[in-house]
Amino acid sequence: MRTNPLTTVRNLGILAHVDAGKTTVTERILYLTGTTHKRGEVHDGTTVTDFDPQERDRGITIFAAAVSCAWAGHRINLIDTPGHVDFADEVERSLRVLDGAVAVFDAVAGVEPQSESVWRQADRHGVPRIAFVNKMDRAGADLDAAVASIRERLHPVPLVVQLPIGTEDGFTGVVDLPRMRALVWADGADAAEEGPVPGTLREEAARRRRVLEEAVAERHPGALEEFCDRETLTAATLTGALRDLTRTGDGVVVLCGSAYRNRGVEPLLDAVVAYLPSPLDVPPVRGTHDGAERERPADPAAPMAALAFKVNATPTGRLTYLRVYSGTIGKGDTVWDAGTRRTERIGRILRVRADRHDPLERAVAGDIVAVVGLKTARAGSTLCAPGAPLLLEPPGVAEPVVHVAVEARRSTETDRLAAALARLTEEDPSLALRTDPETAQTVLSGMGELHLEVAVERVRREYGLEVTVGRPGVAYRETVGEGVTGFVHRHVKQDGGAGQFAHIVLDVEPWEQDADGDGAGGGFVFRSTVVGGRVPQEYVRAVEAGCRDALAEGPLGGHPVTGLRVTLTDGRTHVKDSSDTAFRTAGRFGLRDALRASGMILLEPVVEVTVTVPEDGVGGVLGDLAARRGRVTGSDPRGGAVVVTATVPLAELFGYATRLRSRTQGRGTFTARPTGYAQAPAAVVR
């Protein structure tokens, strides 16, 4: 059983834009907690959490890695998540099982595009956060500017609890504002030396503590009462109020440091323990059974319920990562998969330390562990006690937007390639496989060019297969331009047996989701305005099913159709020959023909790119973006460089990283994030 009480457990993720220092923060946490005995470095390829060869080669996090460590009597289950937009689904699956998060920001760049994306993902899941402004030792580092960008672009209430001591390369420590004590790190030291606030900073520290007190009192009734009585807050009251505001999402505690130089990570760990919630501090997990909503408390004695959020299908077996929400799960237990409605048997239970594992006899509510022995569980599967079924909501999976054709170089290895790709899609639900009906090629789809590069490289490295990869393509969509009214379709079939008869009249019109949807091309709505029972309800449902069948391939290029509303306005039946099958067929072919008359529009995926380039390279970058049909939306000077933002069709970005390096002599970088779909020009349609 657990040695830590549930109140001392923290399940948290490290979130950030790529290169903000997430993995370095994680490595310092592991080192300071005694989990590792050497500081892992991203640039040396010696990190614990980025243990995959590609992660070490590329210097970025690709796969969410779970680690467990201890600090100040607390068990911390930590997940280091990817920062690149192509792996946003890894972040989504991780956030689904976390109780809190540390958002890491670059002290020079502040909020970056993927910072916004992961922050909003955390908002959707209601995950409380604290912020860590990293790289305070860099030239141009500015805590106040970083906090301002957090406030302006992410819209939380930042509650800054530290004052930096020194600037840029002279950054040596912080003033802890709640306790009004200085923490200073000597070069190479693992621990800080604590002392009084330096005389040169006392006035500024007092002013900032006053600002912090006022911000907290304004939002916390208990703190307000003490502040009105005493005109100040004790350290205990301030800490307690900060904890409450963090857990309710009414404030975000902000700390700062330099993880690379080991400065500021100890206070960050203290803040994780002090401010982020335990499994008991978050609402009980909710699920459904037989259509009724049920709750499960974070109680080891309650019926067991767990969610699988990650699968590693290694050549030696499957590792399934679980968040246990309630109850206890033991080695050898039989569990119920609520999705497949099958029983599975738990083999080994492992405490995870990235690529190393410690065996456990059991796991209890609040634990994040890996188990061996599950054969059918996937990311998003609910496992529960057989006698107390419960289905938890799985993490969402985004639709792939880029695809490549993949073939084995040797025809004798086609079956091995199919098995390898199937194993990859088993691990990563954001990858999809299909066979092109015209070419019979295997097509692998994913979230971006890098996502697919990583998948193909895994096939080569892990399975020893030589593969040929086609040019990337994007996932186009088709939508309705003008629409059509009163379109009549009649389905009649007489072949000697039972006849088929269905007569329908359809209106087809463009439709967009609300503001919180994805705008143009935002889905499909079906309705019926038939009166007088001219088409029975069961046939109406069949027409809707047929219409949904027709959406799979549009008339422009066989792309999925979206962004339309179809209304069944009239119809006729035959006393003998009408059936569900007849009306479903009429719906499918009727809508297919109606779309041909509806002035269809081709939609292409569009991304927002953020290019950081030296000032002398801006002209070339702007010209290149224009040639790629890009629309520049902003250009901001930043510390000797210029940050250019633009919206660009995804299809035009293939190979852009190489082109940018060439134009800027290797000094330019860019990131991209999906923003939806937009109408493609006539040249693309042709």
Curated annotation (Swiss-Prot):
Residue ranges of domain tr-type G in the record: 7-280
Alphabetical GO CC annotations of the entry are:
cytoplasm
**GO terms, molecular function:** GTP binding; GTPase activity; translation elongation factor activity
List the Gene3D superfamilies: 3.30.230.10, 3.30.70.240, Elongation Factor G (Translational Gtpase), domain 3, P-loop containing nucleotide triphosphate hydrolases, Translation factors
One biological process term from GO is: ribosome disassembly
State the compartments where it is located: Cytoplasm
Write out the entry's keywords from A to Z.
Cytoplasm, Elongation factor, GTP-binding, Nucleotide-binding, Protein biosynthesis
- Ranges that cross the membrane: none
Quick one: which residues bind GTP? Answer: 16-23, 80-84, 134-137
Q: Which Pfam families match?
A: EFG_C, EFG_III, EFG_IV, GTP_EFTU, GTP_EFTU_D2
Instruction: Family membership, please give it.
Output: Belongs to the TRAFAC class translation factor GTPase superfamily. Classic translation factor GTPase family. EF-G/EF-2 subfamily.
* UniProt cross-references to HAMAP family, sorted A to Z: EF_G_EF_2_B
Q: What does this protein do?
A: Catalyzes the GTP-dependent ribosomal translocation step during translation elongation. During this step, the ribosome changes from the pre-translocational (PRE) to the post-translocational (POST) state as the newly formed A-site-bound peptidyl-tRNA and P-site-bound deacylated tRNA move to the P and E sites, respectively. Catalyzes the coordinated movement of the two tRNA molecules, the mRNA and conformational changes in the ribosome.
Q: What is this protein called?
A: Elongation factor G 2
Q: Which organism is it from?
A: Streptomyces coelicolor (strain ATCC BAA-471 / A3(2) / M145)
Name of encoding gene: fusB
